[in-house]
Amino acid sequence: EQPQLITVNNYDENGFRETLLKITTHTGTHIDPPAHIYNGKATLDSLPPEQFIGKALVIDCRSIKPGGHITLQHITAYGAKAKAADFLLFNLGWDKYWGTETYLGQYPCLNDEAINFILEGSYKGIGFDVMGIDPIDDENLTLHKKLFKNKQIVNIENLKNLDLCGSGLFLFSCFPLKIAN
């Protein structure tokens, strides 16, 4: 669903301009908390601010073919930097397909070894330049369920321009709007 912009006040009638923005919680770049999948788990507004800031590392996965997998080797190739990061951001190069049918297609996803490594670590979040962590045809949301079942972690989707972040650790923040539930 496309965002809607509705003028609620204007200069001529009210002396100022104000716009109502109507969007779903999955519009553009967004964050999934555990409550996205599990009732009673942490919502974005219940997580502490420090959940949304820390050291990030971009994992270059642009060589993976459509329908392929992000493997443990993609992560461990970064050595100590991968373990020192609070956020692992996966650059699949998929943001270039935004607005096309390809974007909604067979984007690469984490394999079991890679997600297990993430779950065994102390990461605050993971992020991707694709629309989800599950394959497009996985209606069961298997990876979402595995990620959020026993871990307080966030999943950031539809990131853009990860290639501009460099190859080292950098300060990253992804503070959401503080809206209840």
Can you describe what each PLM-predicted range is?
Residues E1-N181:
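Active-/binding-site microenvironments in catalytic and ligand-binding cores
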